[in-house]
């Protein structure tokens, strides 16, 4: 989880630069699947030692893993005895979209791929009740997609008051915390940690202060913030585990997702500098990457 905690490298400017190299390296590997260190250095525009040191840090925390050369020979790499790829099991990210009528939740692995229905069930402890454990949040009532091989997601009706909304969100967060603790208890050395939770809202969002400043479709969300929405006990756990929580406008999240989707799927548009997304819901939103 240290990868997402910028405090670990805030003592020196030269070390801060490595955070950028780490993020860029992960971005490249999520699109290229696997690359050797020489090719990574070339694409990052840095020296081989810089790329190698960055990769070593990411490997040390488990974010990258090596692949034997024979397994990647068709990629044209061929410059090293092994190549590097993102370890999808390093940790998970949760996206929660707050709509006028529905709250939707999806879980992504570290390679930014949505979990299948079966994997989602496993991660969210769907079967904990049968093992004699208390159910923190009954995800089963809200699981979508009938095909086990397709991406699974959770869909919950949006409550109609601030009190019920806050209660529902905290039940969801409680369930995510329970899943995270369950992962650590089952296998601490290989636990798939919860790395971050992102909330996407309609209206106007102050991203830096994690506050919804205006909400036209859900007026009771006006002025709600991370500190007022998430209970103290849940915040304490999230912060103690360095789990990042972010607020963003839903149309902007669509633009960001489109950027990563194009890059991950090696689309000719993946390197486009300008992307526009139009979000059609109860209202109309627009996200821009320029």
Label every model-predicted segment.
Residues 2-86, 209, 215, 243, ...:
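Nucleotide/phosphate-binding catalytic cleft detector across ATP-hydrolyzing
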Residues 24, 28, 229, 257-258, ...:
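Alpha-helical scaffold segments in soluble metabolic enzymes
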Residues 66-68, 244-250, 288:
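General beta-strand structural signal in soluble alpha/beta enzymes
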Residues 78-119, 123-125, 141, 277-290:
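Gly/Thr-rich phosphate-binding beta-strand-loop-beta motif of the actin/hexokinase/Hsp70
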């Amino acid at each position: 989880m240290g990868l997402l905690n910028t405090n670990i490298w805030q003592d020196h400017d030269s070390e801060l630069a490595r955070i950028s190299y780490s993020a860029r390296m992960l971005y490249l590997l999520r699109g290229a699947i696997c690359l050797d260190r020489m090719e990574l250095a070339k694409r990052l525009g840095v020296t081989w030692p810089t790329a190698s040191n960055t990769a070593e840090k990411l490997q040390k925390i488990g974010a990258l893993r090596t692949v034997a050369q024979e397994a990647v020979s068709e990629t044209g790499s061929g410059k090293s005895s092994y190549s590097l790829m993102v370890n999808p099991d390093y940790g998970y990210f949760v996206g929660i979209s707050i709509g006028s009528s529905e709250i939707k939740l999806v879980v992504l692995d570290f390679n930014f791929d949505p979990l299948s229905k079966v994997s989602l069930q496993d991660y969210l402890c769907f079967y904990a009740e049968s093992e004699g454990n208390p159910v923190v949040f009954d995800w089963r009532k809200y699981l979508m997609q009938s095909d086990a091989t397709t991406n699974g997601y959770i869909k919950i009706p949006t409550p109609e008051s601030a009190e019920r909304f806050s209660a529902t969100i905290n039940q969801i967060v409680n369930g995510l915390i329970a899943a995270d603790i369950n992962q650590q208890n089952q296998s601490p050395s290989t636990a798939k940690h919860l790395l971050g939770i992102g909330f996407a809202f309609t209206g106007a969002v102050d991203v830096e202060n994690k506050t919804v400043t205006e909400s036209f479709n859900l007026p009771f969300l006006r002025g709600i913030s991370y500190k007022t929405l998430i209970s103290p006990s849940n915040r304490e756990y999230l912060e103690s585990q360095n789990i990042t929580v972010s607020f963003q406008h839903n149309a902007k999240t669509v633009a960001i997702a489109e950027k990563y989707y194009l890059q991950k799927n090696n689309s000719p548009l993946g390197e486009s500098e300008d992307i526009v997304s139009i979000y059609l819901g109860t209202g109309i939103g627009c996200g821009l990457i320029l």
